[in-house]
């Protein structure tokens, strides 16, 4: 799955009292791209307390932390109706920008 697909389908994931979804992706030329390979991990709260590097090394070697799914969902909802982010590509680029520079 690529990062664009994960972002555009973010509402398919719902955290629970026991599980949280977190997105990891592969950087291309030192940055995330819409076509970067991505993985959505379902983590327990106990796993969430682990160091991010430990999660990466044990569950998705070669991938880097992108964002927690609930944050992607909040961002997507915030920009969904804004005029400047009409296309899916613009929405995806904005969320990637946030992950790299604002989070």
PLM region descriptions:
Residues 1-55:
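Extended, charge-biased low-complexity segments
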Residues 39-100:
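Amphipathic protein-protein interaction modules
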């Amino acid at each position: 799955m690529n990062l664009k697909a994960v972002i555009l389908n973010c509402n398919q994931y719902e955290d629970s009292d026991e599980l949280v979804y977190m997105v990891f992706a592969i950087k291309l030329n030192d940055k995330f791209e819409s076509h970067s390979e991505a993985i959505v991990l379902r983590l327990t709260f106990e796993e969430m307390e682990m160091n991010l590097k430990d999660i990466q090394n044990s569950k998705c070697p070669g991938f880097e932390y992108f964002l927690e799914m609930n944050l992607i969902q909040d961002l997507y909802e915030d920009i969904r109706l804004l005029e400047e982010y009409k296309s899916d590509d613009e929405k995806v680029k904005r969320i990637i920008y946030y992950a790299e520079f604002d989070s």
